[in-house]
């Protein structure tokens, strides 16, 4: 199966639809948005964004913008927030797991602080912490806004920047963290489970 991956579109409906169309055209059978599909400062776009995600069957996880917006809506409404938009935000998981693959906005888990902490801060300390606390073979994440690959080999962790259009092999005997980059910067990717390769994709405006 080919997985189309995107993150951090931040309320841009046009680039979101462009990414969906391009990833589908290149054979992605499952699409996953790794959070921050909305912009907490532009809540008026949220209903349309949710409509695009649902119409195109895109799975999503909660990002820090969705978390912040959910709290803002709840505080302003003063009720249970039972409209479709609020219900969708409340239903978003902090992470999703598919076999040995986890999808999250940043640090997986149920602690909202993990939505705000970047895995990529220019070094490997955060990735080392994450590898030590988790067991998944692959983690696909966003939030850091730059396509980066962390590999764990023989207890050594390497950080590699992923260039646009680059294809990287992810061996079954290694663990890896893949930051897909920000869709608002034209970055997305496809993971091919059959060949164990991840390819960075450029989404033009």
List each model region and its residues.
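Active-site environment of divalent metal-dependent phosphoester hydrolases
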Residues: 10-15, 39-42, 65-71, 109-111, ...
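His/acidic metal-ligating clusters that form di-metal
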Residues: 26-30, 82-153
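Beta-strand-turn-beta hairpins that frame and shape the catalytic cleft
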Residues: 1-4, 96-103, 171-177
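Core catalytic region of metal-dependent phosphoesterases/phosphodiesterases
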Residues: 2-6, 11-94
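Short, conserved loop/helix-junction motifs that constitute active-site signature segments
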Residues: 52-55, 132-134, 171
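Binuclear metal-dependent phosphoesterase catalytic core
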Residues: 157-205
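Charged helix-capping and loop-helix junction motifs
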Residues: 44-52, 81, 119-125, 158-163
């Amino acid at each position: 199966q080919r997985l189309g991956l995107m993150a951090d579109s931040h309320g841009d409906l046009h680039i979101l639809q462009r990414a969906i169309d391009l990833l589908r055209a290149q054979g992605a059978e499952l699409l996953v948005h790794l959070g921050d599909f909305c912009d907490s400062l532009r809540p008026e776009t949220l209903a349309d964004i949710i409509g695009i995600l649902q119409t195109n069957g895109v799975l999503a996880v909660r990002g820090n913008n969705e978390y912040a917006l959910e709290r803002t809506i709840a505080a302003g409404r003063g009720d249970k927030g039972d409209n479709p938009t609020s219900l969708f935000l409340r239903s978003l998981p902090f992470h999703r797991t598919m076999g040995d693959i986890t999808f999250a906005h940043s640090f997986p888990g149920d602690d909202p602080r993990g939505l705000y902490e970047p895995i990529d801060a220019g070094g490997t300390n955060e990735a080392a912490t994450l590898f030590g606390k988790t067991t998944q073979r692959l983690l696909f994440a966003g939030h850091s806004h730059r396509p980066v690959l962390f590999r764990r080999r023989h207890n050594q962790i390497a950080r590699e920047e992923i260039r646009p259009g680059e294809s990287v092999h992810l061996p079954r005997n290694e663990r890896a963290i893949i930051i897909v980059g920000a869709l608002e910067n034209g970055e997305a990717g496809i993971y091919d489970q059959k060949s164990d390769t991840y390819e960075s994709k450029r989404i033009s405006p």
